[in-house]
Amino acid sequence: MRDYLASEVRNIVLMGHSGSGKSSVVEAALYFTKATDRLGKTSEGTSVMDNDAEEIRRGLSIYTSIAPVEWKECKINFIDTPGYLDYEGEAQAGIAVGDSALIVVGAKDGVESGTEKAWKTITRRHLPTIFFINKIDEEHASFDKTYQDLRDHFGKTVIPFEVPIMEGDKVVGSVNILRRKAWYYDDRTTPKEVPPALSDIVEEYYSQIAEAIAMTDDDLMEKFFSGESFDENEVAKGLRIGVRNGDIRPVYCGSAVQCTGIERLLDLIREYFPTYAEKGLIEAQDPQGNPVMMETNEQEAFSAQVFKTIVDPFVGKISLLKVLTGVMSTDAQVLNVQKDKMEKLNQIYIVKGKHQIAVGKLFTGDIGAVVKLQSTDTNDTLATRAKPVVYPPIEFPRPMLGVAIWPKTKADEDKMSFALQRMCEEDPSIRLDKNTETHETVLYGMGVQHIDVILSKLKSKYKVEIETSEPKVQYRETIRGTVTAEGKHKKQSGGAGQYGHCFIKFEPCDSEDMVFEETVFGGAVPKQYFPAVEAGLRECMEKGVLAGYKVVGVKATLTDGSYHEVDSKEIAFKAAARLAYKAGMPKAKPILLEPIGKVEVLIPEEYTGTIIGDFNKRRGIILGMDLVDEKEQKITAEVPMAEMQKYATELRSMTQGRGSFVIEFDRYEPAPQPVAEKVIREANLSDDD
């Protein structure tokens, strides 16, 4: 593959619902352009894009994969992203380096939650977009219904550029609306006249295209309303402007597994999607945070951003990056700006699925990989020492589903920690929480399948088998009453004895941490033993008398006591304090506190009633509702954290994958009696075991 400049490169991110055939479209493009000698299929384990063992086993994309094709003197980097919601972190990495989007839609299934999510992304990022209606040859497929579904959901910028030719239930060719010519699959090189049955619809769609073209330029608008036709140059100009601005979003159709519609799709990408050079200027920051404008050409100083990291057991760390400005050369010394460390680019590659092809240079706008960088992670910027710049980080989704994990064999603890650290480097949507209170390692992922893949990979790649359970809820205990209790520790065993004696007043307070005071009069307890009393009480407060949870909101006052001139020691007063705690706290009206979380849920408006009703069942309180746009609602609520353990999975089920949420711990509140009784009973049973 030859070198390509920014004016010849197009970076296309593929998005859409899981199962719509995104990977198959790329496989078809690779095969059609002779980049591969056979049409790869995930189901057969021959896919270039879905090459991981987990992807082959599950029959779906899990990881973002890159594949370049050469087409009519341009290079198209296809960035294939997973459509399944559990792998949104991987998808965001790919979306970050895409300059235009290809949204793939199944001709039988129409608009699904993954399609809607893709639409939100392209509108937020202002990406030029083409829709490809795939699987047009399957039983019960309908171009007309799918197109209308797209139009109903996403508006009049969605315009067909092609319609299929049907003979009975069979697709035999397609009509190019722009050229008003028909191509049949049995003779793909010779254009034919449009079948009479399609003439009216072709003219209707052409009128939609012409009107959209007219809206892109004042001269074209004047010509359109004068009733004049556009020439080829005017059509090309209007389409380029319209597609680039998002005013025109062409719809094409075909069958990736039959390799139909692929040639015209490649032509459309080449002709109407902007090159990377057309960005002109992009914004970065210098190390002090001041804005810096960088030119997207080869003459600008080099800069690149790492968007994905792969830890290969044989090669080591592979950093996938996009050259944002300038030229990247093998053996060059570059600066990791965030870490302020120099890195040597030992070898540069372009990637095609899991395959790496060595190159000497990579130019502005292109995507490639570098191996064995010592200090560089995902989101780091590489640049020159003379012109160090930093680009905005990719915003990865926050994982919300947690499971407690531990290795089946204790000997594997270090191996598990090492493996999880490597996996977090690869996937920023994984989060680990080593909870010192519950002594659990909690693994957070995007969903059940995401966590399942992580555990499967731990076993297959790192040889660590994992046990799991639901994470423990961090309850608290406090008191509502006031009581004074005595603690006396006396030990005599022939030698030096131990003696400590104290009276402790326990009462509620507003402080989360225990407040310790003393009101001892007349030296009943010498000052030197006050710290020992406090230390003994603080140790006890780690384990409440109801269910063994940490105690908060208690003021403990040392009021009186006695000592022995010979036998009193710090350890004795520490023990006496513990005895006072055990005697007094059960009488101070102890209660259980449960953690309350503040939740924000984003859902399509039609699910509002369902979500509110569900929160009521979870003992939640609705704080507010805001209409984010005409179709989306944000609901804010307070809900006990114990009721939200599996909410990531349950929300997806309630909204058909269209909802998302975040939750943050807010405060502790007294648990209702039935809840408290259940928690206390389970804690006592656990202690008995």
State each model region's role.
Residues 1-689:
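Structural and coupling elements of P-loop NTPases
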